[in-house]
């Protein structure tokens, strides 16, 4: 009788524990914990952008009533894996990174993107650059004009093969230009098929520094990720032939190449990067609250987030007119999706 009683107690305890574990797991899946984890790419993980990250985190914390933690990374793949594997609720990532993440986990959904000066998606874009050192410009010209023909047998630096503007867009352009070679993206990831050597900077800043410290002859990187460190020295912004100079007080990693100059040999518009959510980790309620606060006037008018264009402060986004965040659907990223499938 006593044995039966003990077995009954053990069974009851185990049942309660299993139920508690089940409820805990269910709570985790629906995003019911009290912390929202935001994972950032290496480009946005630097100390110089802490104020901007914290400002966004503060807005999310106020909207949801939850603590916000920032997950900083040094590698694109780590950031993507973190959001895919339910170890983060929100991520700021390029279009290609979002596409890769959503392909691996259909719970990944876009929240918002930043607009262009119009305040709409019509001009929500930044720019992918191919840059060379000013003193080497003639090596990349044919009849006085920059030509992609000159890229053959050069040392080339990309950002990461998961980077939209630092790999997918420029590689598509290069593959199209050298159509007779039947190149693939994989061919551009190593020396031999086209380039003599291929480097990956790990971030847009890192790719630019590869050029400026003479590790590479040509580098791909984007305007928005280096704007805090460089200034136009000659010409106009985002124009082929314009010269940019690294600021004297530039933060890491540009502090080792201050005063260096580079010239743009190619400029290509790219769709703006989204903030995305893992719906299994975050949950619909918090998703709706976060999307609402991102799209609010309060967020749009926060100068720590949208830094006025005449300010010397470092920021993630700049404000020249009506820039703000707006909700976006998955279909908006199809042009980038099509590039990566070609």
Predicted segments with their positions:
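Pocket-lining segment of extracytoplasmic ligand-binding domains
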Residues: 155, 166-283
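C-terminal motif of bacterial Sec signal peptides marking the signal peptidase cleavage site
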Residues: 16-20
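Beta->alpha turn/N-cap motifs
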Residues: 42, 72-76, 87-99, 103-107, ...
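Bacterial signal peptide processing site
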Residues: 22-24
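A conserved helix-loop-strand patch within extracytoplasmic ligand-binding domains
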Residues: 114-178
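A bilobed periplasmic-binding-protein/Venus flytrap-type ligand-binding module shared by bacterial periplasmic
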Residues: 42, 127-141, 266-284
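Short, well-ordered beta-strand elements
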Residues: 30-47, 66-72, 155-157
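An extracytoplasmic/periplasmic, membrane-proximal ligand-sensing/linker region
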Residues: 34-36, 40, 44-55, 277, ...
């Amino acid at each position: 009788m006593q044995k039966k009683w003990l077995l009954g107690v053990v069974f009851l305890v185990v049942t309660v524990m299993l139920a508690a574990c089940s409820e805990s797991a269910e709570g985790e899946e629906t995003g019911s914990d009290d912390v929202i984890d935001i994972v950032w790419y290496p480009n946005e993980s630097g100390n110089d952008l802490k104020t901007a990250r914290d400002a966004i985190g503060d807005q999310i914390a106020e909207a949801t009533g939850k603590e916000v933690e920032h997950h900083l990374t040094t590698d694109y793949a780590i950031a993507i894996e973190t959001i895919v594997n339910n170890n983060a609720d929100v991520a700021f990532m390029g279009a290609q990174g979002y596409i890769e993440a959503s392909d691996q986990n259909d719970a990944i959904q876009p929240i918002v993107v930043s607009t262009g000066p119009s305040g709409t998606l019509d001009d929500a874009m930044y720019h992918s650059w191919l840059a060379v050192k000013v003193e080497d410009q003639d090596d990349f010209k044919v009849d006085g004009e920059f030509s992609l023909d000159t890229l053959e047998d050069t040392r080339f630096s990309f950002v990461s093969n998961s980077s939209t503007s630092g790999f997918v867009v420029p590689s598509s352009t290069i593959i199209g230009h050298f159509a007779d070679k039947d190149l693939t993206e994989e061919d551009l990831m190593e020396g031999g098929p086209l380039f003599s050597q291929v480097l990956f900077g790990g971030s847009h800043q890192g790719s630019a520094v590869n050029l400026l410290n003479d590790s590479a002859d040509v580098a791909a990187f984007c305007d928005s990720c280096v704007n805090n460190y460089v200034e136009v020295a000659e010409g106009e912004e985002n124009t082929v032939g314009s010269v940019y100079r690294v600021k004297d007080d530039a933060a890491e990693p540009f502090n080792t190449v201050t005063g260096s100059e580079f010239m743009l040999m190619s400029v290509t518009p790219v769709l703006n990067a989204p903030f995305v959510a893992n719906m299994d980790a975050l949950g619909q309620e918090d998703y709706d609250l976060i999307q609402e606060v991102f799209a609010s006037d309060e967020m749009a008018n926060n100068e720590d987030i949208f830094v006025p264009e005449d300010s010397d402060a470092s920021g993630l986004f700049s404000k020249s007119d009506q820039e703000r965040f707006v909700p976006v659907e998955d279909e908006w990223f199809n042009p980038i999706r099509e590039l990566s499938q070609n």
